[in-house]
């Protein structure tokens, strides 16, 4: 009897799971800006930004660990063989990615940051094919990534002055964050085949979050909420973003090729633009036609990468 595919390995499951993740991650962009205001963090206070990030990911790790321990009716405790992948993932996925992201974002333009961030999806597919040799690169994957990147570039360049500055501690840090994120995507796919992906996600968040918190604290960072209740509600939601999205993403990478999952990441900046416009009133000058064309390009790239091969 033929074994049935896990739901997340089917095309409907893949699409639904990826879009849920992308919507959650897209909401993080406006939430970070709202969080800076609620916690009284100035634009160039790197120490407090890292402390804020560390608190978010520490809570995310605790939520995954406690939640899954209750659901499974046993402690979600890593075994000895899980320690190494947890440390490697926390180094790339949380510490490396978000150390550079939170510092670089305060010094880079939103336009250039979004475009660089979108390249993580292309880099993940390139790393999977050329560095880790977990899958092969083909014309469809390259074309799909190119269309997705074009869509993100279009929606970010519209209404801008067309300039694309670059400074090492700004866009350079965003690029370093992007490389770390792309590498972590490949590593999650590899480790999740032999280890519990949710366990890895929870513990690497906790380890990475504690490291970022320590760095921010030692640098002199402080958090001074202007209003307690909204600030607490926001940090809880941001922890939920990380806990749910990364746990689900790990499951998707465990049962699908990296290329099929990563190409959906081009939806992150699209959700980010739409939610920033809705929650922050940003991008008022962006034409609805431009957004629609960008969405079509991104969706076209996703379809090309996920198109079934002819028998």
What are these regions (language model features)?
Residues 1-54, 163-190, 210, 235, ...:
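Glycine-/small-residue-enriched transmembrane alpha-helix faces in small-molecule transporters
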Residues 28, 69-113, 117, 154, ...:
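Specific transmembrane alpha-helical segments of multi-pass solute transporters/efflux pumps
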Residues 35, 52, 104, 130-133, ...:
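Hydrophobic/aromatic residues within transmembrane alpha-helices
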